[in-house]
Amino acid sequence: MKRTPHLLAIQSHVVFGHAGNSAAVFPMQRIGVNVWPLNTVQFSNHTQYKQWTGEVLAPQQIPALIDGIAAIGELGNCDAVLSGYLGSAAQGRAILSGVARIKAANPKALYLCDPVMGHPEKGCIVPPQVSDFLLEEAAAVADFMCPNQLELDSFSGRKPESLPDCLAMARALLARGPKAIVVKHLDYPGKAADGFEMLLVTAEASWHLRRPLLAFPRQPVGVGDLTSGLFLSRILLGDDLVAAFEFTAAAVHEVLLETQACGSYELELVRAQDRIAHPRVKFEAVRL
């Protein structure tokens, strides 16, 4: 029997709705990955509602929880770490310490850093210290990074002028250490208004993917968290990078189709679960 992969997901959690782990854990489980959720914050709801309650996890709790997993002899069974929204740079450093411990216990373990800073239409949501940490420290450790356009712009200190410029910016981030960069949401002058575009960039090649852009009265939150989680999960399940990239785009589109059909603000993950596991649509990544 083929072993089920195990993934430690260190990101935010909301009690109501879907963001961070609340957007990613169930879909990752649904496609066949055992997920160990470690919540960096626990909020009542995501912050686009403009009001919320809850608390940020103290940075020292992250190594303490990883110590607990090590104490029961399970740390070496962790195949990957996924990190998302950080409440502080100190939280980020605690995560990198945990990644180092896991890679020592399992040298094949992977680390995907989703450098959450905000959304091109919603603005930056983290302090400058977190942005600096992600670029100067996390990028050197991560196997994969999955920025959106706002985050890529922040890393580059400028906005792109074209698709080739987006590619150059992604390659500059790649040069800091990761094996692959997935740009989850491209935005550049001249981009078709009816398309949603993504990039996959490695040292050897790059691929561009376009899918239809779906209209919503209010853009759902958690799409980037869902994207990063599914991409890493498909890698753990045996996909190559391009296959994981294409699957992720299709599965996320299926969720958005269901969400749009229901007129929902929150992602319709439960209703779309079979289409997450077996997308009916397919989008081809074109090599650039």
UniProtKB/Swiss-Prot annotation:
Q: Name one GO cellular component term.
A: cytosol
UniProt enzyme class: transferase
Q: Which InterPro entries match?
A: PM/HMP-P_kinase-1, PyrdxlKinase, Pyridoxal_kinase_PdxY, Ribokinase-like
Ranges in coiled-coil conformation:
none
Q: Could you tell me which Pfam families the record lists for this protein?
A: Phos_pyr_kin (PF08543)
Q: Which GO terms describe its biological process?
A: pyridoxal 5'-phosphate salvage
Q: What is its EC number?
A: 2.7.1.35
Q: In which pathway does it act?
A: Cofactor metabolism; pyridoxal 5'-phosphate salvage; pyridoxal 5'-phosphate from pyridoxal: step 1/1
Instruction: List UniProt keywords, sorted A-Z.
Output: ATP-binding, Kinase, Magnesium, Nucleotide-binding, Transferase
User: Subunit arrangement?
Assistant: Homodimer.
Q: Which family does it belong to?
A: Belongs to the pyridoxine kinase family. PdxY subfamily.
This one is known as Pyridoxal kinase PdxY
Record the organism. Pseudomonas syringae pv. tomato (strain ATCC BAA-871 / DC3000)
Gene (UniProt): pdxY
